[in-house]
Swiss-Prot record:
Sorted UniProt keywords: Coiled coil, Isopeptide bond, Phosphoprotein, RNA-binding, Ubl conjugation
Protein name: S1 RNA-binding domain-containing protein 1
Gene3D superfamilies xref list: Nucleic acid-binding proteins (2.40.50.140), RuvA domain 2-like (1.10.10.650), Tex N-terminal region-like (1.10.3500.10), Tex RuvX-like domain-like (1.10.150.310), YqgF/RNase H-like domain (3.30.420.140)
Gene coding for it: Srbd1
GO molecular function, one term: RNA binding
Lineage: Eukaryota, Metazoa, Chordata, Craniata, Vertebrata
Modified residues (Phosphoserine): S951
Length: 982
């Protein structure tokens, strides 16, 4: 901190009350020699954060006579060129006369610099980056093509601001952000969308949103800036992840969601700050220092701490009541000139609070304590101090818990009844468990800050920040010591505890929601089992087991109810066998709900006896979470009218194996039932994350626009329920879509929506050819074919050129329409044709071309980025039937069953991950009870390279090989060790 500044002597003993925060910018540490000296001092002006000082009126530039034009001078328009000031650059107010005399010299030097740069251009990529409209409007030199910058008004003396090359600018204002690659260690420019302006938040604060976002998410500032711009431009996460990788440094969707959540939090804080500012202004309590303190707030806890004294209350704070008694001047005098302070002069026997000297000392103490607790430098010091000291969170059994809460509920929190852990090492699931116990009045939680923190804090305050300006009598130093102690215990410690608890809870909730999203992604991307006739079984006791047989195309073939657990098992077995043989069904899908274990044992026994011969029947267990909710929903009633809701559940269970993604998107993802503490976290955050994960999965898998359902279509990036409905109506009215461009004709689908969704909708070319050929055989002849291919009636304003629509083979790939011209040039470069898309010949030509010339050189030749070219290569080489879900695991089909009593320690088994939490992974090993792999046994070495990524960790559906560590039969608990991922 800077050295202490000496303060002006106070002539009067009863000094006028000053601004309560004006002292904050002046107090700082000082040497012992300053106490002996009593010289007059002058307060220094507070330096702004951006270090820019506006020029005074007298220093404005005087316009002299215009110089004659020459080949080395700028034309008249060049005076309007805007120069982007660099952050933290030295600032000086230029004298008007000096500036006028040196103006011509500055311009001449600038022109010479520009001329030299034109002679020695920096070799860069062939495709130059575009600057925004402000830079493009600057007039070029008459003799050259580069823009000329006028001398910066903030430059010191005759030093001219260094001119940057055109390639060094992104968005037209800030320096270009670079991405490091192996072939280009210094980084290559990240291309940005045209027309993107600088980041301007709706609500301005004293902190930079990009910098704070980077600090909280641990992501590079330039990446955060690009992400903010992309989100401000209404881009969706799937679109950004696939088609804007170069702007986000190849981050995955989980990181983008984290950035968006943090950004929303910061914006919510900013909005609440300005709302609180307006409220305080209306009450007439606003001061400049309070305004700056509010604008410095970055969290809700800081905002509440700063604005708490100004809330409407009956009594106000202790400091406010002391100020109303006129003791604020005494507090300032104690700090600035303690030798002139006489507390006896404040005694007024007839005024409560001023009648005794002890009351006056207490009032001054409260004012000083409030000043200390509101000082930014003091809070920054104590926060930094806590980062390097032992701070623990403790939980214990509440005294009244045994009287009001059930004993079974208390036993659930046995681990936390005498619990203590460092806040830097505590696990997220422990925080959520402690919070739940506290909310249920079972646990008492507190944060313990060691005494060493208090001692060092008080020592720093006395010796540095809050050191009096001059000699202070012992009784005054006692007041100051009491103020520090009171401020620390009563104000600062509660604030720190709230901040620690809020940070721990926020991080734990985010991790819990992220884990829920990862589990949901694994379920949605479970590999489908197409081409099979399936029997879905919804188990039950009294009301029987509901059966539903569906065709390979998900059509309902038969529904029935059988009573397997009511003494009629043998007779019902004949019915089941008859149904399986009649529909040639070899796969049974059993829901994991009530009576699942008994139903599984029933089918396993029949299969082991070869009862269904000649059919080789297998079965699998799937989660039926959400099936009952969906069965009574309007969507289910519309899809399966007239069918009993109980039978709809059986249909849904069967379809979850045939096409999990298409079935699971039909209901709210929070009902799927994978995750941890989902009811304890923010429901808004949970819903936003799960909806985003569903959108991500559906978009990356892609949909066939001509056959997909409305429910699936509404989850595509850029679409919603209304747009999906309009697309279906357009398809029913005009026939199938011939190419992606026709999406622009759908009502409510503007350019932005088309940009976001176009790359994720596919148009099957075989389906289009079949449709067109069917029109040839129609009795109406060629005229009807043309009418159907156009997909709309010709109006008066329609051109004949619009009547004929030509299918585009690129519409069946993941290539975005904005890259079609690059894809065509790439095909020409490798000697390929549209007919070879998705065939082995295309892959061979791509490999030969990239073998001769690497992908980076090819990207430069095509004037595009490596990421865009990679998407084009993937789209051209992937087979027409490519599905990203084929890389994920399929359901585990079984023929036999194992009991819990059969397990032995050391037995090696294979199983399927059922759920993943922050403390471990639950694995279904076929014994009716899932075993737990503690998180300490899931090491990076046991995971494959593809599973080490943050978004592809162990999740539901993963097949693993485990070893039994412990079997607790009375408690039905199984401990497992992960051997490897299958």
């Amino acid at each position: 901190m800077p050295s202490l500044r000496k303060r002006v002597k106070i002539q009067a003993e009863n000094a006028e009350p000053k601004d309560e925060c004006s002292f904050f910018s002046e107090l700082s540490s000082g040497s012992e020699e300053d106490n002996k000296e009593d010289s007059i001092w002058e307060p220094q002006k507070k330096v702004p954060r951006n270090r820019r000082q506006p020029a005074s009126k007298g220093s404005k530039r005087k316009q002299g006579p215009r110089a004659k034009k020459s080949s080395q001078q700028v034309d008249d328009e060049s005076k309007d060129v805007a120069v982007k000031e660099e952050l933290n650059s030295p600032v000086a107010i230029v004298d008007a006369d000096l500036e006028e005399k040196s103006h011509k010299l500055q311009t001449t030097k600038t022109l010479k610099t520009a001329a030299k740069k034109q002679k020695k251009p920096v070799p860069r990529a062939k495709k130059r980056l575009k600057v925004d409209e402000e830079t493009s409007q600057a007039s070029p030199l008459e003799g050259g093509g580069s823009n000329v910058e006028t001398p910066s008004t903030s430059a010191c003396g005759n030093v001219c601001k260094k001119e940057e090359s055109e390639d060094s600018f992104t968005f037209g204002q800030s320096p270009v952000k670079r991405i490091r690659t192996e072939s280009c260690p210094q980084g290559r420019p990240a291309r940005v969308p045209d027309g993107v302006s600088d980041i301007k938040e709706e609500v301005e604060m004293n902190w930079d949103v990009v910098q704070v976002l980077s600090e909280r998410t641990n992501i590079e500032p330039w990446v955060c800036a690009n992400i903010i711009r992309l989100f401000n431009d209404d881009n969706t996460i799937p679109f950004i992840v696939r088609y804007r990788k170069e702007l986000i440094n190849n981050l995955d969707a989980d990181f983008l969601r984290e950035v968006r959540q943090t950004l929303d939090e910061l914006r919510d804080v900013a909005k609440k700050v300005h709302s609180r500012i307006q409220k305080i202004k209306k009450e007439g309590k606003m001061s400049e220092c309070l305004l700056q303190a509010l604008l410095n707030c970055k969290t809700f806890e800081e905002l509440e701490h700063v604005s708490a004294p100004y809330k409407m209350g009956s009594k106000g704070t202790k400091a406010q009541r002391a100020k109303q008694l006129g003791l604020e001047g005494a507090a300032w005098t104690l700090l600035e000139n303690p030798g002139q302070l006489n507390l006896l002069s404040y005694i007024k026997p007839d005024v409560k609070g001023l009648s005794e000297l002890n009351d006056i000392e207490t009032g001054v103490q409260h004012i000083l304590a409030d000043m200390i607790a509101k000082d930014k430098d003091t809070l920054d010091f104590i926060r930094g101090l806590c980062k390097h000291r032992y701070i623990c969170i403790q939980s214990s059994l509440a005294k009244v818990s045994s009287k009001k809460v059930n004993e079974k509920e208390v036993d659930k929190f046995q681990l936390y009844q005498n619990f203590s852990c460092n806040i830097r090492t505590i696990h997220h699931h422990q925080i959520l468990a402690i919070n739940r116990g506290e909310n249920l009045k079972i646990l008492t939680v507190k944060v313990n800050i060691s005494d060493g923190v208090k001692n060092e804090f008080c020592r720093w305050c006395i010796q540095n920040r809050w050191r009096p300006r001059g000699f202070a009598r012992p009784e005054l130093m006692k007041i100051l010591h009491n103020s520090l102690d009171d401020s620390f215990k009563r104000l600062i410690v509660p604030l720190l505890c709230r901040e620690f608890r809020a940070k721990l809870t926020s991080d734990a909730e985010k991790q819990s929601v992220m884990m829920f999203g990862q589990n949901l992604r694994q379920l949605l991307l479970t590999s489908p089992v197409p081409g099979r006739t399936l029997m879905g079984v919804d188990p039950g006791y009294k009301h029987g087991c509901k059966l539903a047989i569906i065709s390979p195309t998900s059509q309902i073939l038969h529904t029935d109810v059988v009573y397997l657990h009511c003494g009629q098992g043998f007779r019902e077995a004949e019915k089941i066998k008859r149904l399986l043989l009649h529909f040639n069904c070899r796969t049974v899908v059993i829901g994991n709900g009530t009576a699942c274990r008994e139903t599984e044992a029933y089918f396993a026994d029949l299969i082991m006896k070869n009862y269904f011969a000649p059919l080789d029947v297998v079965y699998c267990i799937v989660s039926e979470a959400g099936a009952s909710i969906y069965s009574v929903s309007p969507e289910a009633n519309k899809e399966m009218p007239g069918l009993d809701p109980n039978l709809r559940s059986a249909v849904s269970i069967a379809r979850r194996v045939q096409d999990p993604l298409a079935e699971l998107v039909k209901f709210d993802p929070k009902h799927i039932g994978v995750g941890m503490y989902q009811h304890d976290v923010s429901q808004t955050l949970l819903k936003a994350t799960l909806d985003s994960v569903v959108e991500e999965c559906v978009s990356f898998v892609g949909v066939d626009i001509n056959i997909c359902s409305e429910v699936l279509l509404r989850h595509i990036a850029g679409l919603n329920a209304n747009r999906a409905k309009n697309i279906i109506e357009w398809r029913e009215k005009n026939g199938p879509f011939i190419n992606r461009e026709q999406l622009k004709k759908v009502k409510g689908l503007g350019p932005k929506s088309f940009q976001q969704c176009a790359g994720f909708v596919r148009i099957n070319q075989d389906y289009i050819r079949t449709f067109c050929s069917s029109q040839h055989t129609d009795s109406s002849g060629q005229s009807q074919e043309t009418a159907m291919v156009t997909n709309e009636k010709l109006g008066k304003k329609k051109n004949k050129a619009d009547a004929t629509l030509i299918p585009n083979p690129l519409d069946q790939t993941c290539i975005h329409p904005e890259s079609y011209d690059i894809a065509v040039r790439f095909l020409s470069f490798i000697g390929g044709t549209m007919c070879e898309i998705g065939k082995p010949e295309m892959q061979q030509k791509i490999n030969v071309s990239l073998g001769k010339e690497g992908i980076e050189e090819t990207a430069e030749r095509l004037q595009t980025t490596v990421h865009t070219l990679q998407v084009i290569i993937d789209g051209l080489s992937q087979p027409k039937t490519f599905d990203i879900r084929t890389d994920f695991d399929k359901p585990d089909f079984k023929r036999s069953i194992v009991c819990l009593e059969d397990l032995q320690v050391g037995t090696v088994l294979t199983g399927k991950v059922e759920n993943a939490t922050l403390f471990g992974v639950f694995v279904d090993i076929g014994v009716g009870k899932a075993g737990l792999i503690p998180i300490r046994f899931i090491t990076e070495a046991k995971l494959s390279k593809t599973k080490r990524r943050r978004s592809l960790g162990l999740g539901p559906g993963e097949k693993v090989e485990v070893k039994v560590l412990n079997v607790d039969i009375p408690r039905s608990r199984i401990s497992l060790d992960l051997l490897r991922v299958l």
